[in-house]
């Protein structure tokens, strides 16, 4: 039998594993974003949809950080999934589009809402995860004792 393919060897480099985790997470995040974008487009939601995606992604990454996720979970779900799911570039383009259409008040409200709600989402996710993690640990400990 021939030599085993480098991809099938059990001793993959940590960098290759990390890259795979980011790619897998990004694939999931991009597909989730595409699904949300398709649903929002059919409902004519416009920039509200992008703001919603950014807030949800911020909530998720805040929860990940608050739960004390390990480095590999952070790569897969934080860098990968949340990075692909949220969309700063579309937010920026939507803002420019509103400004060039001379909808200054709407542009200002959009920028303010996106930033404040996203930061609030990250803070809420972080706080809730910090509060829930010890409770889950106690429940798991109680379940294992019985």
Protein language model annotation of sequence segments:
Residues 1-146:
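Membrane-interface helix-loop junctions in multi-pass transporters/channels
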């Amino acid at each position: 039998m021939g030599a085993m393919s480098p991809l099938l060897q059990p001793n993959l480099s940590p960098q290759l594993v990390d890259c795979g985790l980011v790619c897998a997470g990004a694939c999931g995040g991009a597909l989730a974003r595409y699904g949300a974008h398709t649903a929002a487009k059919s409902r004519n939601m416009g920039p509200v949809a992008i703001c919603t995606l950014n807030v949800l992604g911020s909530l998720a990454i805040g929860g990940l950080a608050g739960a004390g996720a390990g480095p590999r979970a952070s790569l897969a779900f934080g860098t990968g999934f949340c990075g692909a799911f949220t969309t700063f570039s579309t937010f920026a383009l939507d803002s420019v589009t509103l400004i060039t259409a001379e909808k200054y008040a709407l542009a200002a409200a959009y920028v303010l809402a996106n930033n404040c709600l996203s930061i609030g989402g990250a803070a809420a996710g972080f706080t809730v995860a910090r509060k829930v993690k010890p409770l889950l640990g106690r429940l798991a400990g109680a379940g294992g004792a019985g």
